[in-house]
Curated annotation (Swiss-Prot):
Domain of life where this protein originates: Bacteria
Family to which this protein belongs: Belongs to the UPF0303 family.
Disulphide bond pairs: none
Cited Pfam families: HbpS-like
Record-given protein name: UPF0303 protein BOV_1367
Gene3D superfamilies xrefs: Haem-degrading domain
Taxonomic source organism: Brucella ovis (strain ATCC 25840 / 63/290 / NCTC 10512)
Amino acid sequence: MAQGDDNKQAIGQIIRQEQALIFPSLDENDAFSLGQRIRDIAVKDKLGIAIDISLWDRRLFFAATAGATADNIEWLRRKFNVVRRFHVSTYRLVLEQNREDRMFAPYKALDVADYALAGGGFPIRVSGAGVIGAVIVSGLPQREDHNLVVRAVAEHVGQDPVALALPAA
């Protein structure tokens, strides 16, 4: 199958993820539980990552595991800005934009210092409220960052993470 076809299938699956992974509500306790779930997976699998769960106006959860770097923290911020701007998964945008340089097209006027075209940011969509924030992971290859977030969010909201997972690249 051609790369373009693979991307189209992955984009379709990510759209299904975004439609299925809706929180009934989200408060500080939910954010802590979800963040701890991601951290537990990372510690068990020895993944060096940084984790951020934020609403548009404030951070609710942050953690880093052994192996995470200061660069990962900066990537969290830039991925958050992308989710805030577009209200979709950052990996979806990576596949839609199909750019090797990880920068948005110049006509979008998005400074690379503030916006990263890289997987690992996922919108927090609350039933009846819409997108209110983002769950972000940084430290793994971008598809793995995305898959880790989707797995944890799916488990948190009672969806089957296997059914929603992207196929191996």
